[in-house]
Amino acid sequence: MGMVSEFQQFAIRGNVIDLAVGVVIGAAFGKIVTALVEKIIMPPIGWAIGNVDFSRLAWVLKPAGVDATGKDIPAVAIGYGDFINTVVQFVIIAFAIFLLVKLINRVTNRKPDAPKGPSEEVLLLREIRDSLKNDTLKSG
């Protein structure tokens, strides 16, 4: 079997296609969560604690300046505000995945309904058994 045909069989399998669909949907969901966090969740939180824009929060290690030749030197800073936004995004995505997995587990682990009574085969086998018992008792 050639390499191309092996790859085609691999790529056409349902699991690979499902994975690809999951990656695309996950990327789109990530963008939605990013917009939710940056545009809807964090602004009211920032407003509540004093008009703080979390995306701009940083610890400046070295302020921006100009060197002797007049060239701008950018500031050196640790942008912890973006980190806070990313953590909030992660928590939202993790919670959504948790709920999805919980739902999938509930659906797949559903116990089948208990049978309402013995099947026709079982009833027939019982009749045969009882008939054989009666025949052996009569002949014995």
From Swiss-Prot:
It is a multi-pass membrane protein. Pfam families: MscL (PF01741). One of its GO terms (molecular function) is mechanosensitive monoatomic ion channel activity. The keyword Ribonucleoprotein does not apply. The keyword Cell membrane applies. The chain crosses the membrane at residues 16-36, 84-104. GO terms for cellular component: plasma membrane. Keywords: Cell inner membrane, Cell membrane, Ion channel, Ion transport, Membrane, Transmembrane, Transmembrane helix, Transport. It is found in: Cell inner membrane. Its main location: membrane. SUPFAM superfamilies: Gated mechanosensitive channel. HAMAP family: MscL. Belongs to the MscL family. Channel that opens in response to stretch forces in the membrane lipid bilayer. May participate in the regulation of osmotic pressure changes within the cell. Homopentamer. This is Large-conductance mechanosensitive channel. The gene is mscL.
